[in-house]
Amino acid sequence: MAAKLWTFLLGFGLSWVWPASAHRKLLVLLLDGFRSDYISEDALASLPGFREIVNRGVKVDYLTPDFPSLSYPNYYTLMTGRHCEVHQMIGNYMWDPRTNKSFDIGVNRDSLMPLWWNGSEPLWITLMKARRKVYMYYWPGCEVEILGVRPTYCLEYKTVPTDINFANAVSDALDSLKSGRADLAAIYHERIDVEGHHYGPSSPQRKDALRAVDTVLKYMIQWIQDRGLQQDLNVILFSDHGMTDIFWMDKVIELSNYISLDDLQQVKDRGPVVSLWPVPGKHSEIYHKLRTVEHMTVYEKESIPNRFYYKKGKFVSPLTLVADEGWFIAESREMLPFWMNSTGKREGWQRGWHGYDNELMDMRGIFLAIGPDFKSNFRAAPIRSVDVYNIMCHVAGITPLPNNGSWSRVVCMLKGQTSSAPPTPLNSCALVLILLLYFV
């Protein structure tokens, strides 16, 4: 009954009901690791593709990701409008002690199990259930059967897509939307994130990756015109999180210096957020030893701050470690996640990372939109990753499922909307009546 009531109240208390618009086609671009200041006013001067989208569309000040500010949790938050503790995708690495199964950033076979994905229904599954057609390119999870459904087409992620892969995906997506083979096309591109990790968020390599994306966007605008899609297609671009500098030389917290690793049943992830499962009888000892460690905070599950919307997740560990910005947690220096490169030397050290407190400035992402349903040359106030789902549902013309997003934060972006206030919710009498009918 409690779960049923939560689902009901989520729908009526945390999201608003409005009539779906007459749907147009929708192209969604997820640009991983794209920090909000990468397209500051100064940066836009040398980014003609992004500049044209901003001048002809909507740009929010920044997008605050869900906690933890990692990829998989926010992939699902963006596509469900729900916090991590609701949709259950709480990390890039997860462990289920009941089944002894692991989710390891989507690369191991067990990551494809419905166990991890069926906690909520993402937009592409809702559209498929409504007999819409969905084409997805390199999108993490598009290869998974979720709630018994798969997208119309999935070009599965195998390795980091190249700039040519990205350009080809955009071109093919536009062809699919034009021909009627697709109603929604969604493309994932990772190179900005990869270069930010390897070389740092301010590095020339990361800036080169951004310029390559900008070139594709410039072509995309022309391709939309060439296909006559200007009045039939909305395009939404967003990122999952930002990126900050890390310094492995002097900002690493080695757990082996404070506890015996033999006292841990399981450790998941390294970096800003690390999950620990102590062996039976060792929880209190490990907790008290780690409480004194500087530059990080150790939380027992029930004491995780409510503002993270994290602790109710069923895969959350008994102990969660959260590092201060720029610090990195690992079992030892030997276990740091070096990246493979041609030298095999210290150039393999990572220079950038994310996953920290989601309210930190460097964790902020982007949101841009352009098309017939969006205002032109409009700057919007900051939004949160849970808000993106509602705007996608609206322009796709489908009623959103119950979610944690705020309609009032996004309605201002739409043409013909003069007020930022959400539609009027059901009055209290009607709500009581529905509750009686629903639960009696």
Curated annotation (Swiss-Prot):
<feature type="binding site">
    <location>
        <position position="32"/>
    </location>
    <ligand>
        <name>Zn(2+) 1</name>
    </ligand>
</feature>
<dbReference type="GO" id="GO:0005576">
    <property type="term" value="C:extracellular region"/>
</dbReference>
<feature type="glycosylation site" description="N-linked (GlcNAc...) asparagine">
    <location>
        <position position="341"/>
    </location>
</feature>
<keyword id="KW-0336">GPI-anchor</keyword>
<feature type="binding site">
    <location>
        <position position="193"/>
    </location>
    <ligand>
        <name>Zn(2+) 2</name>
    </ligand>
</feature>
<feature type="glycosylation site" description="N-linked (GlcNAc...) asparagine">
    <location>
        <position position="404"/>
    </location>
</feature>
<keyword id="KW-0732">Signal</keyword>
<feature type="binding site">
    <location>
        <position position="92"/>
    </location>
    <ligand>
        <name>substrate</name>
    </ligand>
</feature>
<feature type="active site" description="Nucleophile">
    <location>
        <position position="71"/>
    </location>
</feature>
<feature type="binding site">
    <location>
        <position position="354"/>
    </location>
    <ligand>
        <name>Zn(2+) 2</name>
    </ligand>
</feature>
<keyword id="KW-0862">Zinc</keyword>
<dbReference type="GO" id="GO:0006629">
    <property type="term" value="P:lipid metabolic process"/>
</dbReference>
<dbReference type="Pfam" id="PF01663">
    <property type="entry name" value="Phosphodiest"/>
</dbReference>
<comment type="subunit">
    <text>Homodimer; disulfide-linked. Homotetramer.</text>
</comment>
<keyword id="KW-0378">Hydrolase</keyword>
<dbReference type="GO" id="GO:0005886">
    <property type="term" value="C:plasma membrane"/>
</dbReference>
<feature type="propeptide" description="Removed in mature form">
    <location>
        <begin position="420"/>
        <end position="440"/>
    </location>
</feature>
<dbReference type="InterPro" id="IPR002591">
    <property type="entry name" value="Phosphodiest/P_Trfase"/>
</dbReference>
<feature type="binding site">
    <location>
        <position position="241"/>
    </location>
    <ligand>
        <name>Zn(2+) 1</name>
    </ligand>
</feature>
<keyword id="KW-0443">Lipid metabolism</keyword>
<feature type="modified residue" description="Phosphoserine">
    <location>
        <position position="71"/>
    </location>
</feature>
<keyword id="KW-0325">Glycoprotein</keyword>
<dbReference type="GO" id="GO:0098552">
    <property type="term" value="C:side of membrane"/>
</dbReference>
<keyword id="KW-1015">Disulfide bond</keyword>
<feature type="glycosylation site" description="N-linked (GlcNAc...) asparagine">
    <location>
        <position position="118"/>
    </location>
</feature>
<feature type="binding site">
    <location>
        <position position="354"/>
    </location>
    <ligand>
        <name>substrate</name>
    </ligand>
</feature>
<keyword id="KW-0472">Membrane</keyword>
<feature type="binding site">
    <location>
        <position position="32"/>
    </location>
    <ligand>
        <name>substrate</name>
    </ligand>
</feature>
<dbReference type="GO" id="GO:0016042">
    <property type="term" value="P:lipid catabolic process"/>
</dbReference>
<feature type="binding site">
    <location>
        <position position="240"/>
    </location>
    <ligand>
        <name>Zn(2+) 1</name>
    </ligand>
</feature>
<keyword id="KW-0597">Phosphoprotein</keyword>
<feature type="binding site">
    <location>
        <position position="197"/>
    </location>
    <ligand>
        <name>Zn(2+) 2</name>
    </ligand>
</feature>
<dbReference type="InterPro" id="IPR017850">
    <property type="entry name" value="Alkaline_phosphatase_core_sf"/>
</dbReference>
<dbReference type="GO" id="GO:0019695">
    <property type="term" value="P:choline metabolic process"/>
</dbReference>
<feature type="disulfide bond">
    <location>
        <begin position="142"/>
        <end position="154"/>
    </location>
</feature>
<keyword id="KW-0449">Lipoprotein</keyword>
<protein>
    <recommendedName>
        <fullName>Glycerophosphocholine cholinephosphodiesterase ENPP6</fullName>
        <ecNumber>3.1.4.-</ecNumber>
        <ecNumber>3.1.4.38</ecNumber>
    </recommendedName>
</protein>
<feature type="glycosylation site" description="N-linked (GlcNAc...) asparagine">
    <location>
        <position position="100"/>
    </location>
</feature>
<keyword id="KW-0479">Metal-binding</keyword>
<dbReference type="GO" id="GO:0047390">
    <property type="term" value="F:glycerophosphocholine cholinephosphodiesterase activity"/>
</dbReference>
<keyword id="KW-1003">Cell membrane</keyword>
<keyword id="KW-0442">Lipid degradation</keyword>
